[in-house]
């Protein structure tokens, strides 16, 4: 039985992970749950899965949780703060850590899991977007293992030969017969919206993804295709891919989750319903397979599968992310931080949808980008970029 810590248990990925546990009670045991401030959901999870530990972001949330659990006779030990989260990621009895805390807050707990030599089920994009080389070097040093949870990276992983799967981030694609990686994306809810109408799009419209059920922040990132840009950066690190070895495709149906092109002309793809439980279950059980709870793909009900090249005028955030990778980790860190601030401002209706890309670019242009040598350096770049972004939002929204 595999013992799990789930970082970000009350979020979308965390809840889907627990659903996979629910479907496979003899295969997985939850040792620790870590979350932010959603006390009610954490209480429900603790009562159903009886973890040994539960960690909340702050003491107030932890106290509320403690009272709720005591009323139900739960023996789960309640802790709070980032240090406790890092300790849960490194517990001796835990072999697998689901890293699903969104944003820069997930960096240190994920790093703690890596340094403890765990198998990390990586759903936190920011870990590689901001700390790609630092994290990949630490994985090798600590003999940890990364298994990608993002549906696209998981699809690529499944389509690659074992020689690359067992040496992620370092294997030479060309020497293993791989020509390129094809990263697919739906194009989001505004794929066919006239360009002249994009400025008027509301947060609710941006969050109506045609295929996936996701949180509001990542839904906006899908609409701008910043999500695909961050996935591009992540794929470059995970699969040791050059710009020449990467292709980005718009695939509106979200049935093919990504592909790998081989030197002999073959293209291997992973298909499935757009349900995150599929890649989650794959990483949890790898190299075996378990029931995910997802519906099987019905080929007889599929419409045509279509593909097109991305329009960078419609999706400037995608181009911005691809260019940031070439500038280095300081640029990708600053872009990610700026984007979190600008998306939050859009969701709060402080700026327009079309302001997001321009503000992100403005932050990059105002930053003095020195390559970070440590996670502390990354966090400093992150903090400065957030402050610059906040000032840009205030200036624009006056």
From Swiss-Prot:
Would you identify the family this protein belongs to, as annotated?
Answer: Belongs to the DXR family.
Name the NCBIfam families for this protein.
Answer: Dxr, PRK05447.1-1, PRK12464.1
Q: Which residues form a coiled coil?
A: none
- EC code: 1.1.1.267
HAMAP family, sorted: DXP_reductoisom (MF_00183)
Catalytic activity reads: 2-C-methyl-D-erythritol 4-phosphate + NADP(+) = 1-deoxy-D-xylulose 5-phosphate + NADPH + H(+)
State the pathway, as annotated in the record.
Isoprenoid biosynthesis; isopentenyl diphosphate biosynthesis via DXP pathway; isopentenyl diphosphate from 1-deoxy-D-xylulose 5-phosphate: step 1/6
Q: Briefly, what is this protein's role?
A: Catalyzes the NADPH-dependent rearrangement and reduction of 1-deoxy-D-xylulose-5-phosphate (DXP) to 2-C-methyl-D-erythritol 4-phosphate (MEP).
InterPro entries reported for this sequence:
DXP_reductoisomerase, DXP_reductoisomerase_C, DXP_reductoisomerase_N, DXPR_C, DXPR_C_sf, NAD(P)-bd_dom_sf
Q: What class of enzyme is it?
A: oxidoreductase
The protein's name is 1-deoxy-D-xylulose 5-phosphate reductoisomerase
Required cofactors, per record? Mg(2+); Mn(2+)
Q: Which residues does Mn(2+) bind?
A: 150, 152, 231
Question: What Pfam families does the entry give?
Answer: DXP_redisom_C, DXP_reductoisom, DXPR_C
Q: Per the record's keyword annotation, is Transmembrane included, yes or no? A: no
Q: Which residues bind NADPH?
A: 10-13, 36-38, 124, 126, 215
Where 1-deoxy-D-xylulose 5-phosphate is bound, by residue? 125, 151-152, 186, 209, 222, 227-228, 231
Q: Which GO terms describe its biological process?
A: isopentenyl diphosphate biosynthetic process, methylerythritol 4-phosphate pathway involved in terpenoid biosynthetic process
